[in-house]
Amino acid sequence: MFPTDPVSNLATLIRCPSVTPAEGGALTALESMLTPIGFKADRIVAREAGTPDIENLYARIGVGGPHLMFAGHTDVVPVGDEIAWSHPPFSAAIAEGEMYGRGAVDMKGGIACFVAAVARHIEKHGAPKGSISFLITGDEEGPAINGTVKLLEWAAAKGERWDACLVGEPTNPGGIGEMIKIGRRGSLSGRITVQGVQGHAAYPHLADNPVRSILQLAHALMDPPFDDGTENFQPSNLEVTTIDVGNAAVNVIPAKASAAFNVRFNDLWTAESLMTEIVARLDRAASAGALRPGRAPVKYEIVWNERPSHVFLTRNDALIESLSGAVEAVTGQQPRLSTTGGTSDARFIKDYCPVVEFGLVGKTMHMVDERVALADLETLTGIYETFIARWFDHAAA
């Protein structure tokens, strides 16, 4: 039986408790949908010291080009307070036209719809005019070390090449058809630490309060703005995400303070140029002494996250026009091409082929009572099916 019904496909996937790093049966369920319609599937377990082993799936139909990849993940975030859910989070319960369950939107729903779209395409037209592959990881919501990165490396090493990729992440803010993601901002994280001298709060002259120093440095990171944005990207933005002193006593000046930060940056910067700018800001602030009158310049240490994400923008007309045309044909609206939001595994795929993202409405992702409208599943399946036909026509032209 062809898996042409996205509702049935999604219910099967939701019932698999695949909270990162557990496979939970989700990849097995997906494989059982794909093999009857002609896909050959491989299961790859990726490993790295200090991280959980992760099971991934790569499935392909066809042997020649053009080659379209669909990428995504079956792992989901924890359910949170299960008692707060209206329906059990892995039950795939349907109520008032919506299916409830962890991963319904992010992003088992997108996978279920693309499976249905491919099955419908094959049922109507036979095998695709080239190849279609599914690159599905169980490590997107986690560290993202043993997932898409290693699956791409494995596939490329065995000779796989792709002409384009669609990632099925939820991209629409309020309704299906609003937004296609054609790029992503870069992401850079770090932590600065300042050593002080611990002492009694009543005798500050005998101590050196590192909180003053860390506030001075943190302010310099956030102000002034890094830029005003570009044609395709919003302004780069730095947020201080934690300030920690490890001190529970109200009458003790702490011995050290640290602050973590994250920058989402546009195409005016690279990770390297942004690091240089941040260090320059910290150096200037360290010598200013505004919050530390009469004290020596602040001495700080900075540690960078080992894996910054680089900014990218996809400019592949065949891919973008095929998808935007499919969205307009099915929904009647022209989607906005956007680079907003957080990072996704598209940041890894961009090094192998042009990539865009389009999926469900993301309003309830990661929330209690994550859910998707059944009508949206049918609409997205229709868009995906139309896109598949249009993309192969474009690619063959």
UniProtKB/Swiss-Prot annotation:
Output the SUPFAM superfamilies linked to this UniProt entry. Answer: Bacterial exopeptidase dimerisation domain (SSF55031), Zn-dependent exopeptidases (SSF53187)
- Can you tell me which residues form the catalytic site? D75, E140
Keyword list, A-Z: Amino-acid biosynthesis, Cobalt, Diaminopimelate biosynthesis, Hydrolase, Lysine biosynthesis, Metal-binding, Zinc
Q: Indicate the enzyme's highest-level EC class.
A: hydrolase
Task: From the UniProt record, list the reaction(s) this protein catalyses.
Answer: N-succinyl-(2S,6S)-2,6-diaminopimelate + H2O = (2S,6S)-2,6-diaminopimelate + succinate
What are the binding positions for Zn(2+) 2 in this chain?
Answer: D106, E141, H366
Instruction: Quote any Pfam family the record assigns.
Output: M20_dimer
InterPro entries, A to Z: ArgE/DapE_CS, Bact_exopeptidase_dim_dom, DapE_proteobac, Peptidase_M20, Peptidase_M20_dimer, Peptidase_M20A
* Protein residues bound to Zn(2+) 1: H73, D106, E169
The protein's required cofactor(s) are namely: Zn(2+); Co(2+)
Q: How is the cofactor bound?
A: Binds 2 Zn(2+) or Co(2+) ions per subunit.
Q: Can you state the subunit structure given in the record? A: Homodimer.
Family note: Belongs to the peptidase M20A family. DapE subfamily.
List the NCBIfam families: dapE_proteo, PRK13009.1
Name of the molecule in the record: Succinyl-diaminopimelate desuccinylase
Gene symbol here is: dapE
